[in-house]
Amino acid sequence: MRDLQARIIHELNVRATIDPAAEVVERVDFLVRYVRAAGASGFVLGVSGGQDSSLAGRLCQLAVERLAEQGVAAEFIAVRLPYAVQNDEDDAQLALSFIRPERTVAVNIQRGVEGVGNEYRDALGEDMTDFAKGNVKARVRMVAQYAIAGQRRLLVVGTDHAAEAVTGFYTKYGDGGADLLPLSGLSKRQGRALLQHLGAPARLYEKAPTADLLDQSPGQTDEANLGLRYSDIDDFLEGKDVAEKVAIAIEARYLATEHKRRVPASMFDDWWTGGGFGR
């Protein structure tokens, strides 16, 4: 195993093999213990219809049910956050039918995103790029979730897992902003195994993952964006041998996105002196 590969696996807490049933129990227990320690009233999570939010959502609902068994009143709000009309709305509804949240609400982010875009144009005399606008979409979605969380004393749940963390494939202070991460340490295929254990419809974990943030490239897959296959990323994270060019590409993305995995830098930090900057 490569030295940096071993360090990454350790830092991201990835296990080479897992027991899906035990992982579900452990992660639900984490959610239960954390919400009680925080003195919060439950969870809020944006549900898109993909693998990650489907899994995180089901874990949240199971945690709320566990809390009820312990005599603790808690709620879980699943939030639909479309930009105008979501092309894969059927998948989102399928995810909700699997998650079975106690409450579902919808916040259309289009006016918020366009408002930021209009103010940007007025202030700087230019339009945002499609990439910048995509990041605004992710950040407005998180603003909406924190508005709900702040009003109702809930915790915002993130969907980041090891395969995203190693590549930095999320928007800083967008989908990368959350109070807790119940999928942390899982590779993509391990998350899929948990969904299979939980009886999720195959569509939710077989569809090609996509952030779907770009107007000019709707439905662009994560793998096309990354230039890497999740199967290779998973092999790397699980300590398996991968082609050298693949390992180099993964390690380069990890080093370039270190800033995303850190709290804001201060003059007392030194992690940034060795690099750690990317998109």
Swiss-Prot record:
Quote the EC number. 6.3.1.5
Positions binding ATP in this chain are G46, V47, S48, G49, G50, Q51, D52, S53, T159, K188, T210
Gene Ontology molecular function = ATP binding; glutaminase activity; metal ion binding; NAD+ synthase (glutamine-hydrolyzing) activity; NAD+ synthase activity
Q: In which pathway does it act?
A: Cofactor biosynthesis; NAD(+) biosynthesis; NAD(+) from deamido-NAD(+) (ammonia route): step 1/1
Q: Which UniProt keywords apply?
A: ATP-binding, Ligase, Magnesium, Metal-binding, NAD, Nucleotide-binding
Q: Which domain of life is it from?
A: Bacteria
Q: Which reaction does it catalyse?
A: deamido-NAD(+) + NH4(+) + ATP = AMP + diphosphate + NAD(+) + H(+)
Binding residues annotated for deamido-NAD(+), in chain numbering: R139, K172, D179, H259, K260
**Keyword Nucleotide-binding (UniProt):** yes
A GO cellular component annotation here is:
cytoplasm
GO biological process terms, semicolon-separated = NAD biosynthetic process
Residues that bind Mg(2+), according to the entry?
Answer: D52, E164
Q: Name one Pfam family in it.
A: NAD_synthase
Q: What does this protein do?
A: Catalyzes the ATP-dependent amidation of deamido-NAD to form NAD. Uses ammonia as a nitrogen source.
Quaternary state and partners of this protein?
A: Homodimer.
Q: Which family does it belong to?
A: Belongs to the NAD synthetase family.
Which named protein is this? Answer: NH(3)-dependent NAD(+) synthetase
- From what organism does this protein derive? Leifsonia xyli subsp. xyli (strain CTCB07)
